[in-house]
């Protein structure tokens, strides 16, 4: 929106307030001013001249010698090449010494042997953009009307001392797409009064209903239509003041009738359209929806193909305008027009927006209709335009307005709670201060206790909720005046909780052991959830109400399927070995239909495949196996101080290898499992031998760990004894180790499993397990007899509790 500062001063007293101050105030009030255009552009010394004589240059076919009166004692001779220069014209003359935009200085000069003492100017040479210049002056000099005084300042006559504010409006402030809204905004910001001209059209000659009837077929898309008749008009150029205001606002003057409709559009924000009444083709106006494929030629001489949801203005048969977008060429106001039908209507914003978008046709009218115009100003704008047309085109307004439909004027009441507003804005405004702001804005209100019931004017369609009023109060009070406050709160010593510290230990240990952390989706498919839930197999899959896809339709109950997806993805991309883990949540419920939030439980899972060590000169490469996984977990439990509480027991889990899977228990309570994926499942997923583990982190970390105890380096030698035991194949090494540690006494410091044998030379159903036992006393050197006694006691207990016998 381009706002002329001089035009704005007609409505608001801005004496002593510069355009720059207005721009600053508007910007700080939420109406951003992008730039201030200075129309003068540094021009000086241009006056109104009168061409007394014009004859052809003796030495040039396309030049003229002009004698021009410029308000001085003697006329001056000027050489002019404009094709439209003629005697009797009043023109803009840049005198010798004048400066034109671009710092172009005018000097005396000889052109083809003839002296030229100045320059007769076109509007473009005075800084007017070519697109705003009237067609008749586009290729030549500008000609003033006869009422302009000779010798007066031509720049002032052309309003070139004006400044234009370019507003960058947000979509909610369409009320400022017109001078009416801007005037009230500026008046509110500066606490001024608005002096708005009264708009009354007093038609006296006959009744408009004798000329035309109006009918609306779709009242939802066209709630109101009004037609005013102005007869005996004489179409011609607009007066200079009207042309100047249109040019300043970025609109090219066309003719007095059309210029008035554009002027009122800028003034009120209400789009109007002027039809040549005699070219309508009937005395009837009917608004209706287009027929699919119906065609019409618009004012830009383009044939448009219409759709069935486009709203048209018709003469009862043929379309004469696309409602709210553009008029038709057949009913255009032309030089011989004598009777004008002036349209003032309210069209549905969505209907106008769709037609404009479908046709690729955007106009000043459509841009306002699609944002919603003020229904309260429709009739007022029509009356203002009718009066101006009669004034500038010499017409007579026919009595009455022919109307159809009704204007629904909505002014919603919005409540504002003062303490709530102060709390939200961080201010302490009183009732009187808030009331004064609403008075400046022109908002009606009532007050009861701390509550304001506020009614905004119909032009302010953006005021709908309490927060809108908060914004208005803050804008008018001044954002810069809102006190700056900093958050207040006591400082506390930062630190991680015990749970967080343990989680960090897990991450640090696993990464040190060579595993990489991954993060996978919390959503999966129901099919993938089957068969690998581990200890969560009794829980039902939880489907999402509106999934993005079937691949992400179910909340996970296990981390393992997701890790296997990661393994599969990387193996397919030539990664031969992969060691990964994830700390994440699973979602558990035993209800088919959820009546409460599912249980969210944090789990730790890992997946390992490929070679654990590479083939180097120090030794052969080693593939991942169950004991690698078990060793990693034992190291992690040692880091957490849980070594003495954790046991691995042979077990079975869905989707896991039956002979290479162990249940992990802490103090006899199951917290997870570790083992190899079942070969059939590996084959389905096209995986190599892959091992996984999954632990319930919350159950694990709630256990109290043993504190690390530091001991001095031993001064006395230790004694080691190896034992190889033959046991039933269902007896685990962990069971044997527990018996050994329970009966080894204080001298037994370490128990290390170093051999497991099954196969040839072993009785069926039996296996051999060998341990190395280390005995040590920090106070003295142990004797063989002392160690042998303890060792034999261990063997007796092993035989009694597990049936183990010493291997011969």
From Swiss-Prot:
InterPro entries xref list: aa-tRNA-synth_II/BPL/LPL (IPR045864), B3/B4_tRNA-bd (IPR005146), DNA-bd_dom_put_sf (IPR009061), Fdx_antiC-bd (IPR005121), Fdx_antiC-bd_sf (IPR036690), NA-bd_OB-fold (IPR012340), Phe-tRNA-ligase_IIc_bsu (IPR045060), Phe-tRNA-ligase_IIc_bsu_bact (IPR004532)
EC top class named in words: ligase
A Pfam family hit: B3_4
Keyword check for Metal-binding: yes
Cofactor binding, per record: Binds 2 magnesium ions per tetramer.
Residues given in the record as Mg(2+) binding sites: 462, 468, 471-472
Domain tRNA-binding per the UniProt entry, residue ranges: 40-155
Catalytic activity: tRNA(Phe) + L-phenylalanine + ATP = L-phenylalanyl-tRNA(Phe) + AMP + diphosphate + H(+)
Any GO MF annotation of the entry: tRNA binding
Localization, UniProt: Cytoplasm
Subunit-level organization: Tetramer of two alpha and two beta subunits.
Name of the protein in question: Phenylalanine--tRNA ligase beta subunit
Organismal lineage: Bacteria, Bacillati, Bacillota, Bacilli, Bacillales
Gene name per UniProt: pheT
């Amino acid at each position: 929106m381009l706002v002329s500062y001089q035009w704005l001063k007609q409505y608001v007293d801005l004496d002593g307030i510069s355009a720059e101050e207005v721009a600053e105030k508007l910007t700080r009030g939420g109406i951003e001013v992008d730039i201030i255009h200075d129309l003068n552009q540094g021009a000086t010394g241009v006056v109104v001249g009168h061409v007394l004589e014009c004859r052809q240059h003796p030495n040039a076919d396309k030049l003229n010698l002009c004698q021009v009166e410029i308000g001085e004692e003697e006329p001056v001779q000027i050489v002019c090449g404009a094709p439209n220069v003629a005697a009797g014209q009043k023109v803009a003359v840049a005198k010798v010494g004048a400066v034109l935009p671009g710092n172009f200085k005018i000097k005396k000069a000889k052109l083809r042997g003839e002296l030229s003492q100045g320059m007769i100017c076109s509007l473009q040479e005075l800084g007017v953009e070519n697109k705003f210049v009237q067609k008749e002056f586009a290729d030549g000099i500008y000609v003033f009307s006869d009422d302009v005084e000779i010798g007066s300042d031509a720049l002032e006559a052309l309003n070139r001392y004006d400044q234009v504010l370019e507003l960058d409006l947000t979509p909610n402030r369409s009320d400022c797409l017109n001078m009416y809204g801007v005037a009230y905004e500026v008046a509110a910001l500066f606490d001024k009064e608005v002096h708005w001209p009264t708009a009354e059209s007093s038609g006296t000659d006959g009744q408009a209903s004798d000329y035309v009837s109006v009918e609306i077929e779709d009242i939802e898309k066209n709630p109101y239509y009004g037609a005013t008749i102005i007869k005996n008009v004489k179409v011609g150029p607009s007066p200079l003041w009207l042309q100047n205001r249109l040019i300043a606002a970025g609109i090219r003057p066309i003719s007095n009738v059309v210029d008035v409709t554009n002027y009122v559009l800028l003034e009120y924000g209400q789009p109007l359209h002027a039809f040549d009444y005699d070219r309508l083709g009937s005395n009837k106006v009917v608004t209706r929806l287009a027929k699919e494929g119906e065609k019409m030629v618009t004012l830009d001489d383009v044939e448009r193909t219409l759709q069935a949801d486009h709203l048209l203005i018709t003469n009862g048969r043929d379309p004469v305008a696309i409602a709210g977008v553009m008029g038709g060429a057949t009913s255009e106001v032309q030089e011989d027009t004598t009777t004008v039908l002036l349209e003032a209507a309210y069209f549905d914003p969505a209907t106008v927006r769709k037609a404009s978008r479908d046709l690729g046709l955007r106009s000043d009218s459509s841009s306002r209709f699609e944002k919603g115009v003020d229904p309260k100003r429709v009739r007022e704008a029509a009356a203002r335009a009718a009066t101006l047309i009669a004034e500038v085109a010499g017409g007579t307004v026919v009595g009455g307005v022919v109307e159809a439909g009704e204007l629904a004027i909505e002014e919603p009441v919005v409540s504002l709670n003062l303490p709530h507003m102060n709390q939200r804005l961080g201010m302490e405004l009183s009732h009187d201060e808030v009331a004064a702001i609403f008075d400046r804005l022109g908002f009606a209100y009532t007050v009861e206790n701390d509550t304001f019931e506020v009614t905004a004017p119909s032009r302010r369609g953006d005021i709908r909720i309490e927060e809108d009023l908060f914004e208005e109060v803050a804008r008018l009070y001044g954002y810069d005046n809102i006190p700056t406050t900093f958050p207040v709160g006591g400082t506390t010593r930062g630190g991680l909780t015990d749970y967080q510290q343990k989680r960090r230990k897990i991450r640090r240990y696993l990464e040190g052991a060579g595993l990489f952390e991954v993060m996978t989706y919390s959503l999966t498919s129901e099919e993938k959830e089957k068969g690998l839930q581990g200890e969560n197999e009794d829980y039902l899959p939880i489907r999402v109400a509106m999934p993005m896809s079937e691949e992400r339709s179910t909340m996970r109950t296990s981390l393992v399927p997701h890790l296997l997806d990661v393994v599969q993805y990387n193996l397919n991309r030539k990664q031969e070995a992969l060691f990964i883990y994830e700390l994440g949540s699973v979602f558990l419920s035993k209800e088919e239909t959820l009546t409460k939030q599912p249980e969210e439980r944090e789990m730790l899972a890992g997946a390992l495949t490929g070679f654990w060590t590479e083939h180097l000169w120090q030794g052969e490469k080693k593939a991942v196996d169950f004991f690698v996984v078990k060793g990693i977990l034992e190291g992690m439990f040692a880091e957490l101080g849980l070594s003495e509480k954790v046991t691995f027991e042979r077990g079975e889990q869905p989707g896991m290898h039956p002979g290479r899977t162990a249940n992990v228990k802490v103090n006899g309570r199951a917290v997870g499992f570790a083992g190899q994926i079942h070969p059939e499942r590996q084959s389905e997923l096209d995986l190599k031998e892959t091992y996984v583990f999954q632990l319930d982190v919350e159950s694990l970390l709630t256990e109290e760990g043993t504190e690390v105890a530091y001991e001095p380096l031993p001064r006395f030698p230790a004694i080691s004894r190896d034992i190889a035991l033959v046991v039933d194949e269902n007896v685990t090494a962990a069971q044997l180790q527990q018996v050994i540690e329970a009966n080894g006494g204080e001298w037994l410091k370490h128990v290390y499993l170093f051999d497991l044998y099954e196969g040839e030379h072993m009785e069926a159903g039996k296996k051999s397990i060998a341990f190395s036992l280390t005995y040590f006393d920090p106070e003295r050197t142990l004797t063989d007899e002392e160690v042998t006694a303890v060792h034999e006691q261990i063997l007796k207990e092993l035989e009694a509790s597990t049936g183990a016998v010493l291997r011969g």
